[in-house]
């Protein structure tokens, strides 16, 4: 049966939330890239927002991000190659590694924070 009114496909809350999130992500990535951080993806940003300033265990990052440990390790490998994180021994358990920000990673987090603030202001 042919539809006479297909407007419902884009005139609903779910579509509008998706479109707003898509724009938010694009704005955030554009700001980060303009800040000198080329090669940063939304997946990497989702990793970074789950790392504490003092460092975080891989299993904790995975739980916070809702990702598998294997996926998080792949993201950490990419972030390490970009020079924004490093792995080091956990001071509380030498058998465990934690992921910490490098000075470049700290600057990226500051840039990300400013990008998020700017994107939120544009939406307000």
Predicted features by range, described:
Residues 10, 43, 92-94:
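Short, solvent-exposed coil/turn segments
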Residues 19, 23, 50-53, 118, ...:
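Alpha-helical structural segments
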Residues 27-71:
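N-terminal helix-turn-helix DNA-binding core of bacterial DNA-binding proteins
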Residues 12, 46, 122:
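Active-site phosphate/pyrophosphate-handling residues
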Residues 77-124:
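Charged, amphipathic alpha-helical coiled-coil/dimerization segments
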Residues 11-14, 18, 22, 66, ...:
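Short amphipathic alpha-helical segments with heptad-repeat character
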Residues 74:
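DNA-binding alpha-helical recognition surfaces that contact promoter or target DNA
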Residues 1-39:
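N-terminal leader segment of winged-helix/HTH proteins
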